[in-house]
């Protein structure tokens, strides 16, 4: 949770790498000292941006026995792929190519997002996928049909979509009803 929020909403972007390095150093020190999590289902969280009270989805996963190993969303790893070609003859075309190839749910067809999710599942040895759909994000809600099909039929993993918002009003239902029932957390 601290890692998710630790690098966002900073006005001094120059300090962000230092903050992230501190977190990495702390984690690596604890790892070398033998501090490890017990085996838990490894969960990929995908969908809408996470921050503020929407972190309840991550808390619910981890409070119910899972561990979030990757986040693929509008403000996460999705935006890091396909860097802008700096030596391109037309920099505007290079910028357009970068943003048009981002696997965002408003793009169609959106094979890039499916490919990225597949890569994350393989690289992080994911046991299940939780898609967070914010109320009003109709593009992510509509695309969740394709994500569910890919995850369950091609990757043969459990998938659940959690409809929520940035409030705390549904924290109980998100935690107990949705995620406790998710077969990844209850059966693995």
Where are each of the predicted segments found?
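A short, acidic, amphipathic alpha-helical segment used as a generic capping/interface helix at domain edges
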Residues: 108-125, 143-146
């Amino acid at each position: 949770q601290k890692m998710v929020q630790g690098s966002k909403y900073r006005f001094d972007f120059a300090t962000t790498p230092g903050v992230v390095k501190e977190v990495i150093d702390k984690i690596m020190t604890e790892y070398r000292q033998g501090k490890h999590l017990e085996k838990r289902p490894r969960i990929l969280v995908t969908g809408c941006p996470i921050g503020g009270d929407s972190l309840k989805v991550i808390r619910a996963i981890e409070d119910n026995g899972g561990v979030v190993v990757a986040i693929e969303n509008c403000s996460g790893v999705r935006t890091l792929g396909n860097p802008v070609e700096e030596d391109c003859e037309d920099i505007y075309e290079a910028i357009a190519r970068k943003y048009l190839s981002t696997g965002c749910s408003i793009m169609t067809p959106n094979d890039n997002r499916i490919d990225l999710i597949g890569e994350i599942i393989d690289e992080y040895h994911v046991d299940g996928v939780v898609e967070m759909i914010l109320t009003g994000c109709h593009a992510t809600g509509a695309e969740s049909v394709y994500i569910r099909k890919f995850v369950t039929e091609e990757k043969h993993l459990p998938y659940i979509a959690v409809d929520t918002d940035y409030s705390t009003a549904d924290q109980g239902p998100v935690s107990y009803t949705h995620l406790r029932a998710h077969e990844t957390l209850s059966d693995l």
